[in-house]
């Protein structure tokens, strides 16, 4: 693979990817794109894009270069393609669209007002959609702010700053010291041949996978099960409702969730850790919150090793400590964290709803633009630019004439080749 030459523009690069491939081939001029060229990705992430790079690129075959004729404004064409793509995605109702064919794209019916009105529409869309994108960017920053807010709440919780808990009210208790005083209260999933894919069943006792343990929330529904016989055989790896689950592997490891109280007993898989908390020492929810704090996450990373994927050393994990106050003070801490997290969740829900409305707003504005609603006053103010030789009808006749000329040239070339 070349490390220099002409960069090859792929869909990943259109979407911000910085991993480039290169070519030393000398290709026909139409296989290259320059800054400002209109492009269309017809696979994966559908839609129109601008070539925004200062140097010449070879565009990948999953990308088309769109060259509007003299009868169509290029910026107007970009927005028309954006509108059509949005309508196609909406009509798919969530079904993945594998690709768009070139012949299919050429059959699209497009809106084509007079050229002057095209430019007016493009200018209005530039202004309106820039405002939409600015609003969207501000909304998209809020979840990151909320993530930092939650971490600051957890940091305050385990330091006593969130409630009236003094620093000397905390005791550093090891993870194994927090476990119930019974066999198998702290452990990892089964190794290798102890649980094979061939042991999986369509029904029975559920398995818990790493993918279900994420950021304080347990994932939806088990997809794999084991038989009652296998379940008994793996009793050391059972997880009970209310147990704390920790990812043993990941990038980084250490995600935490509580196994829901309304779930049946299950079996954790290889890269999970389970902890049954001794309720005389700590509240399960307090332990979960303390383990989600940045301080504890860094401790977990410090005892992890691996190249492709980091894995937690269980022996060292047992010896990690959590700052643990009295049960009474834990109750107050959990109450305050619940309260603040609920507040953050409410804001996040509102933001997600607002983002959905903003995303719909783009398509709504485009639809209005191509129904002529954004330029109604412009047409009244500029009748000379949309009538006579500037009318849409005259534009259509010009396009038909250009097509006839193109057909004649094509036939002439074919005749020469046949010789």
What residue spans do the PLM features occupy?
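Short amphipathic coiled-coil heptad-repeat segments
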Residues: 120, 127-168, 349-380
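Non-catalytic DNA-recognition/assembly elements of restriction-modification systems
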Residues: 107-122, 152, 165-191, 319, ...
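Sequence-specific dsDNA recognition surfaces
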Residues: 1, 5-35, 177-197, 211-241
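Specificity-determining recognition surfaces
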Residues: 81-110, 206, 290-322
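A short beta-sheet element
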Residues: 10, 24, 29-82, 209-210, ...
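Amphipathic alpha-helical coiled-coil segments
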Residues: 336-350
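Short, solvent-exposed loop/turn positions at domain surfaces
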Residues: 26-27, 94, 194-195, 233, ...
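Amphipathic heptad-repeat alpha-helical coiled-coil/stalk segments that mediate oligomerization
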Residues: 375, 379-409
């Amino acid at each position: 693979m070349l490390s220099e030459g002409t960069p090859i523009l792929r869909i990943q690069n259109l979407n911000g990817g910085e991993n480039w491939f290169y070519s030393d081939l000398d290709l026909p001029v139409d296989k290259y794109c320059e800054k400002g060229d209109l492009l269309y990705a017809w696979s994966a992430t559908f839609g129109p894009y601008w070539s925004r790079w200062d140097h010449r690129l070879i565009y990948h075959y999953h990308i088309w270069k769109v060259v509007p004729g003299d009868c169509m404004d290029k910026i107007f064409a970009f927005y028309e393609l954006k509108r059509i793509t949005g309508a196609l995605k909406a009509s798919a109702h969530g079904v993945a669209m594998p690709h768009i064919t070139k012949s299919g794209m050429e059959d699209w019916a497009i809106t084509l007002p007079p050229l002057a009105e095209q430019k007016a529409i493009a200018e209005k869309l530039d202004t309106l959609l820039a405002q939409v994108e600015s609003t969207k960017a501000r909304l998209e920053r809020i979840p990151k702010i909320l993530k930092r807010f939650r971490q600051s709440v957890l940091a305050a919780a385990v330091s006593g700053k969130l409630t009236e808990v003094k620093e000397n009210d905390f005791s550093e208790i090891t993870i194994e010291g927090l476990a119930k005083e019974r066999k198998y209260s702290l452990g990892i999933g089964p190794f290798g041949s102890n649980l094979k894919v061939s042991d999986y069943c369509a029904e029975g006792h559920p398995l818990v996978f790493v993918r279900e343990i994420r950021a304080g929330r347990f994932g939806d529904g088990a997809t794999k099960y084991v038989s009652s016989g296998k379940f008994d055989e793996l009793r050391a790896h059972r997880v009970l409702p209310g147990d704390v689950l920790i990812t043993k592997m990941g990038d980084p490891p250490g995600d935490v969730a509580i196994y829901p109280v309304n779930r049946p007993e299950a079996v954790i898989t290889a890269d999970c850790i389970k902890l049954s908390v001794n309720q005389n020492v700590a509240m399960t929810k307090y332990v979960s919150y303390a383990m989600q704090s940045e301080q504890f996450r860094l401790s977990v990373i410090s005892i992890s090793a691996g190249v492709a994927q980091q894995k937690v050393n269980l022996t060292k994990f047992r010896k990690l400590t959590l700052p643990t106050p009295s049960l009474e003070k834990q109750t107050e801490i959990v109450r305050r964290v619940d309260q603040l997290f609920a507040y953050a969740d409410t804001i996040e829900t509102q933001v997600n709803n607002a983002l959905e409305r903003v995303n719909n707003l783009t398509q709504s504005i485009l639809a209005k633009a191509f129904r002529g609603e954004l330029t109604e006053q412009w047409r009244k103010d500029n009748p000379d630019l949309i009538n006579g030789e500037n009318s849409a009808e005259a534009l259509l006749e010009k396009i038909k004439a250009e097509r006839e000329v193109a057909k004649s040239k094509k036939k002439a070339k074919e005749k020469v080749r046949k010789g």
